[in-house]
Every structure is written in C-alpha cells, then in structure tokens.
C-alpha cells in the first residue's frame, strides 16, 4: 500500500498544527545542523502547516528568503494564514519544476522523506535546484529504528490480538517499506549528492492522554495511520489504542518517543 494524500482533512491539519511540537523541535535541530544562516535562500519541502518555515525565515532574515511547499492543500492553507509574508505553494518533492536550477543555498526535508514515493526522483530534483556547495537536510524514519519507538511498542501488542490480528495486514502500512539507513545512504550517493553528516536522533513529547496520542499519530500521517484497518474496526481500534497509551501515563503525561536519522548532504 502506497502513501495516499487523499485522506487528509482540515481537522487532521489543525490537529497536526497543534500537536507537532516534536517535529518542530527536530526540524530546528536539523536547520542548525545544516548551518543555514542569514542571507540564505531556502526551500522547505514538505513544510506542512509552516511552523518550521516561519522559523527558518526569521533565521535567514530580510537578506534571505524561504519558500515552503507541501502536497496537502489543507496544511498549506494554515501555513498561508500563519505567515502571510512567506511564499507557500502546493507541490511535491518529486517535481520542483517551479524552481530554477541552482536557485537555493539549502533544501530542508524535515520529517517528510519517509513519505516520499519516488525518493531517487526527489533527490535528483533537489540536486538540480541546489547551488554548488548547497546543502540538503533530512530527518527520516529508517526501517530498522521504527520498532524502538513508543508508537510501535504500544500498537504492536494491540494489533496482535483478536479481532485485529485476523483482519489487519501490517505489511500494508505505507511505512512498512521504509528504507533502512544503509539504503538511504546508497540512494543519496547514487543521486550524486555527497553525504556530509549522519546521526541518530531522538524526538520526544508528552501527551495529555491516549486519545491525544492517537490524534497525533493519525494527523502526522495525514490519515494513513489506520488505512490498512478495515473500516468497521477503526472506531474500536482507536479506543483500544488510546487505552493502551493511557496505561503508559505518568505524572507529566504520556511520553511518546521515536528514533530516526538526520543527515546533511551537499551538492559538489
């Protein structure tokens, strides 16, 4: 099952904007790792509701510029309201034809690369729009680290029991075919980019209750989280997952952590 863009909604977009602190903080660390500075021209691919894009705009200052693109119309609508002075457009990583060759100092893809269907094509487009010496920064979820996160640890046992075990094909989830770190490195190098830095990252956020965790995961996946679940089971699964997350609740809420990779590549 491939990633679908058709299941997003204004409710999911608004929920994501409200609950996406961990992605926002991870994105800021990525921008710092990329050494984006005043005067840079930056393309934020998969900008979502524009929180990171707005922060980048403040970092590059009036002498620089930033453009945000995202394939999800509802999220671009929120971004345009958030920062009217920034250019936000509906667009996908695989097609950056709206931008001239060698027109950006940096391209940022924070928490989006794992959702991109054609990664080699996207990287080729990124390389085309980067100036010589320009940087690509990516945070992503490699397949071998997904099992270390809270969501997988909680969802696995719930989906492994009846009635879900008999009717839910976990291999159909879009992220089940994520690239491994080794495959990510190979794909980047094959694109002609030079890998400069790669590190393991941890993101963490406390949620008030189990329902909020389910909302967070569903909005972060723009409706893809439960796509592989038969429709007649989704309501009960949401309840069961919320209860399982609630069992992890401590004095400060429910800690939700995930582990991924952050890397910077350069166009030589």
Please provide the spans of the model-predicted regions:
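A short acidic, Gly/Pro-enriched loop at the edge of an enzyme's catalytic core
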Residues: 97-107
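Class I SAM-dependent methyltransferase SAM/SAH-binding core
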Residues: 43-45, 49-96
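Conserved Class I S-adenosyl-L-methionine
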Residues: 5, 22-23, 49-51, 173-268
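Short, conserved SAM-binding segment of the class I
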Residues: 121-125
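Conserved catalytic/acceptor-binding region of the Class I
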Residues: 120, 135-208
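Short glycine-dipeptide loop
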Residues: 62-63, 130-135
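A short SAM/SAH-binding and catalytic strip from SAM-dependent methyltransferases
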Residues: 106-119, 142
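Conserved class I S-adenosyl-L-methionine
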Residues: 1-40, 51-55, 75-78, 92
């Amino acid at each position: 099952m491939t990633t679908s863009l058709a299941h997003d909604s204004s409710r999911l977009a608004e929920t994501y904007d409200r609950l996406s602190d961990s992605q926002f903080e991870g994105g800021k660390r990525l921008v710092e790792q990329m050494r984006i500075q005043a005067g840079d021209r930056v393309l934020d691919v998969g900008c979502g509701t524009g929180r990171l894009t707005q922060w980048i705009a403040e970092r590059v200052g009036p002498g620089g510029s930033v453009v945000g693109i995202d394939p999800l119309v509802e999220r671009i609508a929120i971004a345009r309201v958030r920062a009217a002075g920034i250019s936000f457009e509906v667009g996908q990583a695989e097609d950056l034809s709206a931008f001239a060759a060698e027109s950006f100092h940096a391209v940022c893809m924070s928490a989006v690369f794992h959702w991109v269907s054609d990664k080699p094509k996207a990287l080729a487009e990124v390389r085309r729009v980067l100036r010589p010496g320009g940087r690509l920064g990516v945070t992503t979820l490699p397949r071998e680290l997904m099992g270390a996160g809270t969501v997988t640890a909680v969802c696995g046992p719930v989906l492994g029991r009846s009635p879900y075990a008999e009717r839910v094909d976990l291999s159909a989830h879009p992220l089940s075919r994520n690239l491994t770190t080794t495959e990510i490195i190979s794909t980047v190098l094959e694109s002609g980019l030079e890998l400069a830095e790669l590190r393991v990252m941890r993101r963490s956020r406390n949620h008030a209750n189990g329902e909020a965790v389910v909302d967070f995961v569903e909005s972060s996946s723009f409706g893809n989280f439960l796509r592989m679940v038969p429709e007649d089971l989704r309501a009960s699964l949401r309840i069961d997952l919320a209860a399982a997350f609630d069992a992890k609740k401590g004095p400060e809420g429910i800690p939700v952590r995930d582990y991924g990779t952050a890397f910077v590549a350069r166009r030589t």
